[in-house]
Amino acid sequence: MSAQSLLHSVFSCSSPASGGTASAKGFSKRKLRQTRSLDPALIGGCGSEMGAEGGLRGSTVSRLHSPQLLAEGLGSRLASSPRSQHLRATRFQTPRPLCSSFSTPSTPQEKSPSGSFHFDYEVPLSRSGLKKSMAWDLPSVLAGSGSASSRSPASILSSSGGGPNGIFSSPRRWLQQRKFQPPPNSRSHPYVVWRSEGDFTWNSMSGRSVRLRSVPIQSLSELERARLQEVAFYQLQQDCDLGCQITIPKDGQKRKKSLRKKLDSLGKEKNKDKEFIPQAFGMPLSQVIANDRAYKLKQDLQREEQKDASSDFVSSLLPFGNKKQNKELSSSNSSLSSTSETPNESTSPNTPEPAPRARRRGAMSVDSITDLDDNQSRLLEALQLSLPAEAQSKKEKARDKKLSLNPIYRQVPRLVDSCCQHLEKHGLQTVGIFRVGSSKKRVRQLREEFDRGVDVCLEEEHSVHDVAALLKEFLRDMPDPLLTRELYTAFINTLLLEPEEQLGTLQLLIYLLPPCNCDTLHRLLQFLSIVARHADDNVSKDGQEVTGNKMTSLNLATIFGPNLLHKQKSSDKEYSVQSSARAEESTAIIAVVQKMIENYEALFMVPPDLQNEVLISLLETDPDVVDYLLRRKASQSSSPDILQTEVSFSMGGRHSSTDSNKASSGDISPYDNNSPVLSERSLLAMQEDRARGGSEKLYKVPEQYTLVGHLSSPKSKSRESSPGPRLGKEMSEEPFNIWGTWHSTLKSGSKDPGMTGSYGDIFESSSLRPRPCSLSQGNLSLNWPRCQGSPTGLDSGTQVIRRTQTAATVEQCSVHLPVSRVCSTPHIQDGSRGTRRPAASSDPFLSLNSTEDLAEGKEDVAWLQSQARPVYQRPQESGKDDRRPPPPYPGSGKPATTSAQLPLEPPLWRLQRHEEGSETAVEGGQQASGEHQTRPKKLSSAYSLSASEQDKQNLGEASWLDWQRERWQIWELLSTDNPDALPETLV
């Protein structure tokens, strides 16, 4: 038999039928049953034996053992065949690389540039090429350890492809092997590298510094809280000698019920003949929260259906109204609010929330933060990030990959929050609250209403003692106590430690609790602390004596201690035998709960050292996650070393059009829904590199001074990524402003930049050289008469920003042009700037236009020629009162800067001074200062002084005339006389 026929029989999809096929198939089935649960090495050995027997049978080999036939039976013949060598060489010359460690003596070694790379390739699904490509790609899908370079093709094929558990007989096993392979090392993070400095400060390569501070545990993301559990568990084992075994508590829903509990619950259901399934009492805490959320979603859905039914007529008249409403709805960042936070809230019919969008957990998962766009991430969030109870059923290895990067809502049951709110409002002055008896009938009625899932509104007519008894009964009936049975001994043994160590140990034990237990415990301790503060009698503001409730922290701990921390309930006989021991434990429980009530605020704060450990743990596995978390911490901090915030939204409460599908750093609300994508973060990091390299001191722009819209173009993005030292150099070639981006879309030949802003708040031209307090996306509109002598006015905390100005990142831009005003005049508000500028300049890119008000004029460049005279040659124009600059108008007539104050002002831009025109410029600047005092809503004449001289030099240039004409047309387009031309988001 020739080598060609053998290859055909091996790699074809169907083997030729022969008399021995049935016996081979039967034998293979028996072997498959025998070796299904054996070790892979035994399976490979069995397969090799079968391959040897199959080689003796020749062409009658079955499809299951055909690779062993090639490997064992006829390996020498195929190796000696020239045609087979040619075919094998052509196979290995395919562009799809194999594993870097695989090599055979008969084929040249092919190694990837990095030995740690693992390549995953899709298998072609053609009929003729499926098994061929599979056979030659087997080395790339092997999951076994060891060096593959020392293994022959026969052993490789027999261990992976020919055995009964190989990929040909078990595709599911092959997929699992591919699934558990290490992921491709294609994720590189060269754009930002964070490192810890040892004093809880993290620095990036871009120069950004973040100092960790104590934060509430609720402000941490879901992933951080999961890692915090591990860090606290490690510290408890290493540093705290509690004399007991410590385990991280599992979620109550995952714990199996004992047989006795099952029988007891079955008997109770039969005796009571309930017509409904309990929704609150006697259920795991996570399930109670899931039921509350499901009921809230059902209510929201019914409310939306009712609204849709009432608005069918309007929708039929306006077919696009519904689409527009949904679009606006999805573009806003809706904050997640738990049903337990606002139990009595009613959703406004004017602002509906889509149920799947508004009630998911957190933001994006870890495994999709770098390789999904926004549309895919929305789908991922809706599918993977479902209820907290469902997330616990995942494997522990894949747990972190499904956790959110943003803080999740408070997981507090609706019943607990409703009772606490009612008692805080009506029961703080009730003497003996939680001790006075209640009506069992009314308490049972309230319990049934909550168990049915009814949205119970606890009003003033409800008795305070009934509500207090309901709260105690809920905590007592929980199948697992709030402080969990796993940590029962650990909590009690904290009293054996030194007093200064007890609080820190209690803090670590609280970190071990599941998020639902931790949040519910925080809400309960907060309420009990408020009750304890009203225990003593005091005098009100009116001078009347207010009686206290007499419930001190000790009394409250005596009541709630056994409900929060207890062992599994035992029989009466066991209780009588161990009564003395239980009494001692009860005293310890009361002492522990009392300490927690008195120090609840400190217990739920996460110190910087633990945050640092969490970030170090995440840095080893997910550096991109650490980058996102640290940038969010930086944006939320109020330190002046942060350049800008990462999110922009309007002052009026309406979100920007970029907020729906761009990065959000979590500073809109702690329950933000969006997470960044890798491409955006890399651009942001490059922008930070540029900004930090060029300015000596960085400033933070408050969120309330952020522009609504943005401008986007490839040219502006390329400028954003340019290096920082350019900020101190000549900037006529590469201006860092938005007007240059606009002009690049109109005329690519001109390089003269301008400025954009919000509603015309352009106070200076971006053609001026950058100042120490300038930002990369646009200069702050400053009231310079107020900060004339202080170059660090921004840093000192006295914000002199008059109007909103853009400080948002360029990568978070919308596709439309949302600039509301474009002003070609550098609206410098005092004469001091005019005095700093010479009367004539030879730099064509420092041109300042001679326009006192472009909003009213309708002439073209000829009008500019008629106005090209200095101010001192046109004294009659100083009294004009028919023109006003575009808003924002200059300041309220404070004294302008005089020439005596000029040495105090820093050099704000590069100038080419001329000796012959300096004195004239000073005189004109002083005259402009006087006019600014008398007419605060007029433009200063200092612009006309320097700009008119510049006009005389540039009027002969055709390109400059075209540039002025384009500026004039854009200003007319966006003037107040034509408000319809403004973008929708800025009207």
Curated annotation (Swiss-Prot):
Entry function: GTPase activator for the Rho-type GTPases by converting them to an inactive GDP-bound state. Could regulate the interactions of signaling molecules with the actin cytoskeleton. Promotes continuous elongation of cytoplasmic processes during cell motility and simultaneous retraction of the cell body changing the cell morphology.
Q: Where in the cell is it found?
A: Cytoplasm
> Which is an annotated GO molecular function term of this record?
GTPase activator activity
Q: In which tissues is it expressed?
A: Expressed in retina and lung.
Which parts of the sequence form the motif SH3-binding?
344-354
Q: Which organism is it from?
A: Mus musculus (Mouse)
Family annotation (SUPFAM superfamilies): GTPase activation domain, GAP
- Record field: compositional bias (Gly residues): 44-57
Record protein name field: Rho GTPase-activating protein 6
